[in-house]
Structures are given as structure tokens and as C-alpha cells.
Regions:
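Amphipathic alpha-helical segments
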Residues: 1-122, 144-154
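Conserved phosphate/pyrophosphate-binding and hydrolysis machinery centered on Walker-type P-loop NTPases
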Residues: 127
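Short beta-strand-centered segments that line the small-molecule binding cleft or hinge
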Residues: 134
Length: 154
């Protein structure tokens, strides 16, 4: 029986596509967090302004402005959630593309080299370096993903 071992975590995180995506999403997340912090600061200022004006506003006007602030708060929370969900979906989409590509590569490599089984390194207590195909899969995945990215983008 001929067996190979692969470190899937290293492959999934080590491809240029994964690293580029992580960096892109990190930057987008930082930009969004900065924008959200500014929105929160502005919101806090408006709440404080309303508190100060409470004594001089009519009850009707106060309740109207308070209602506007509540709506603004809900809208801001909704936007934060929406951005977080979008970033998460994008990360999962790219991870799925990488995973599908890696699965195909592992199957092709197993057929080429006559492996009867390919096991994940994380499930093993020991495996000789000679049966580790991680680097080969990583190289092939990078090459295949670059081609796909240049055609349609990840």
C-alpha cells in the first residue's frame, strides 16, 4: 500500500490566493472599522447634543430627534453586520475555490504517483517526510489558481 500525507492547513493558508485574499479582506476590514469608529463617534456626539438640548426642546421635538437617533443607530448596526457578512462570504468563497482546486490536485497527484491513500497530517502521530506531498500540492495549487485568477479573478 502506497500512502501520502498532506498538511491541508499549510496548503489552504499558504497559497498566494489565500494570502492575497486574507490581506485584501484585512485591509477592507480595517477601512470599515475606521469608518464605523467615525460613525460611532458622530453618533455619540449627537446623543450628547440631544441630552443637552432636552430642557429647551418641546417633548414632541425631543421624541422626534430621539427616534431619529434610534433609527440611525439601527442603520449603523445593520451596516456593520452587512459588511462583516460580506467579508465572511468572500473569505468562504475563496476558501471553497482553493479547497476544490486542492482536492483535484491531490487526486491527480495520487493517480500520477500510484498512491492508494492520501491522509491529512493532522490526523497522524508520525509520517516520514518522504511521504509528504504538501509542497508539491502547494506549488501546483499556486500555479493553477494563478491561471484561474488571471482568467476570471478569485
Amino acid at each position: 500500500t502506497k500512502i501520502a500525507v498532506i498538511d491541508m492547513q499549510m496548503v489552504m493558508n499558504g497559497t498566494e490566493a489565500a494570502q492575497d485574499t486574507q490581506e485584501k479582506l484585512r485591509q477592507e476590514g480595517e477601512e470599515a472599522n475606521k469608518r464605523f469608529a467615525e460613525m460611532e463617534e458622530s453618533f455619540k456626539q449627537r446623543v450628547e447634543d440631544l441630552r443637552r438640548k432636552k430642557e429647551i426642546l418641546s417633548e414632541e421635538k425631543y421624541l422626534e430627534e430621539e427616534s431619529e437617533l434610534r433609527k440611525l443607530y439601527r442603520d449603523q448596526q445593520s451596516e456593520v453586520q452587512s459588511v462583516n457578512e460580506r467579508l465572511s462570504r468572500e473569505y468562504k468563497r475563496v476558501q471553497k475555490q482553493i479547497s476544490d482546486e486542492v482536492d483535484d490536485i491531490v487526486q491527480d497527484l495520487a493517480k500520477e504517483r500510484g498512491y492508494d491513500a492520501v491522509l491529512r497530517r493532522g490526523y497522524l502521530m508520525y509520517a516520514s517526510k518522504s511521504v509528504d506531498i504538501t509542497e508539491e500540492v502547494l506549488k501546483r495549487a499556486d500555479s493553477a489558481l494563478k491561471k484561474k485568477m488571471s482568467k476570471k479573478g478569485l
